[in-house]
């Protein structure tokens, strides 16, 4: 039935229209780049990377670009949303994270990779939120295994991974970007997410902006996932915000 029914499903019709719109934008750019112009430097972007990978073989670059967009933007935005949910439910961490960001910035006078690495409480909160709010469709019990994460493994503890990193020999094992058989949010081994280092810095920068420039609070019901098996933000959840004067200018 699917080869025939999919033509009439509203959601699929809408998706096909979006793909068609994407082709109108991307394909002319691909044709422009394929024209031989020795004086033009090849752009360093995802379209160029996809073109390098296909190496002349048949490959739908538009579909590849759309896949990368979903993989890079959707996952990052969901992780940020989940962390915001956890912080409004545990507001004591909002003040602590602001203090950490202010301290690091005043020491380094700028934001760079080293200063972002110093935001260890923020990294711990990010990993704790990722542990409790699983993005994959397959539930993983070991992410809440009390033998690994403690008797309170069902509760949000923003200091959990900060403490675990203080154990001898485990300083790097429990960073946000670290993978292991006990923590599979980014996969593990050869197939671990290659973009997790960029995503970590991206999330930290976004959270610094949100923490220092805004106050948040829940308007109605406590924020939660739409599904128990994996984290999907509830679109009916309302988080109110208002501007605040940041303690530092950046």
Spans of features found by a protein language model:
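Active-site rim elements
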Residues: 113-116, 188-196
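Conserved cytochrome P450 K-helix/beta-meander segment immediately N-terminal to the heme-binding cysteine loop
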Residues: 144-173
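Cytochrome P450 heme-binding "Cys pocket" and the immediately downstream C-terminal segment
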Residues: 178-179, 190, 196-234
């Amino acid at each position: 039935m699917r080869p025939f029914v999919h033509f009439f499903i509203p959601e699929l019709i809408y998706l096909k229209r979006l793909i068609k719109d994407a082709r109108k934008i991307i394909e002319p750019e691909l044709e422009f780049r394929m024209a031989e112009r020795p004086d033009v430097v090849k752009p360093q972007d995802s379209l160029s990377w996809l073109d390098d990978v296909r190496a002349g073989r048949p490959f739908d670059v538009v579909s590849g670009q759309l896949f990368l967009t979903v993989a890079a933007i959707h996952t990052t935005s969901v992780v940020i949303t989940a962390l915001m949910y956890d912080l409004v439910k545990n507001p004591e961490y909002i003040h602590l994270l602001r203090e950490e960001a202010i301290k690091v910035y005043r020491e380094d006078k700028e934001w760079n990779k080293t200063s972002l690495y110093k935001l260890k409480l923020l990294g711990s909160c990010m990993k704790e939120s990722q542990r409790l709010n699983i993005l994959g469709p397959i539930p993983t019990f070991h992410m809440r295994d009390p033998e690994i994460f403690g008797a309170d493994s069902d509760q949000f503890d923003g200091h959990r991974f900060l403490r675990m990193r203080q154990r001898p020999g485990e300083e790097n094992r429990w960073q946000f970007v670290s993978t292991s058989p006990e923590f599979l949010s980014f996969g593990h081994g050869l197939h671990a997410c290659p973009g997790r280092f960029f995503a970590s810095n991206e999330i930290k920068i976004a959270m610094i902006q949100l923490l220092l420039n805004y106050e948040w609070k829940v308007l109605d019901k406590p924020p939660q996932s739409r599904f128990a098996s994996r984290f999907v933000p509830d679109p009916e959840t309302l988080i109110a915000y208002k501007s605040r004067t940041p303690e530092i200018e950046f």
